[in-house]
């Protein structure tokens, strides 16, 4: 195994350990937060078109942190229209980045590959489910996601 493969595997293993240790506990209602992420809130962009599983997981962890911050602002009464527009814009950029990195990660795209990382699939599913539940908890009648099942 090459040194870069060992580094990626090591990074992936530590991500899995942090992911399992942090979990998705915590409430999902307003102000409930996203639970612990095991210190996975940092984001490290890579300049190549190929991303490691730990980079993808970090991106989705960042989304969770942003959603939790929005929930906190809403619960605290400081969520004005201006702040809402700024936060949603930042959330959209972060989601686009996370999905772009997901598409550029062989841990998701090469199903029959040894690079497949099941932790990324689990994290992606839980992150998107959390995002859906968070949005629908605010105003369920105003949020519509056709064909989304959680």
Curated annotation (Swiss-Prot):
Q: Quick one: which gene encodes this?
A: INF24
Q: What does this protein do?
A: Involved in the development of infection structures. The germ tube elongates across the leaf surface of the infected plant until it recognizes a stomate. Physical stimuli provided by the stomate induce differentiation of the germ tube to form a series of infection structures involved in host colonization.
The protein's organism comes out as Uromyces appendiculatus (Rust fungus)
What triggers production of this protein?
By the physical stimulus of an oil-collodion membrane.
> What is this protein identified as?
Infection structure-specific protein 24
């Amino acid at each position: 195994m090459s040194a870069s493969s060992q580094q990626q595997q090591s990074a992936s293993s530590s991500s899995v350990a942090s992911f399992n240790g942090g979990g998705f506990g915590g409430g999902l209602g307003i102000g409930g937060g996203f639970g612990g992420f095991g210190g996975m809130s940092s984001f490290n962009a890579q300049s190549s078109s190929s991303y490691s599983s730990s980079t993808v997981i970090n991106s989705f962890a960042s989304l969770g942190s942003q959603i939790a911050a929005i929930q906190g602002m809403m619960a605290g009464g400081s969520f004005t229209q201006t702040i809402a527009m700024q936060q949603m814009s930042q959330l959209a950029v972060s989601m686009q980045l996370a999905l772009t990195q997901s598409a550029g990660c062989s841990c998701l795209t090469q199903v029959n590959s040894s690079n497949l990382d099941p932790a990324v699939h689990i994290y992606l599913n839980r992150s998107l489910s959390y995002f859906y539940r968070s949005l629908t908890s605010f105003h369920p009648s105003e949020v519509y996601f056709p064909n989304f099942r959680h």
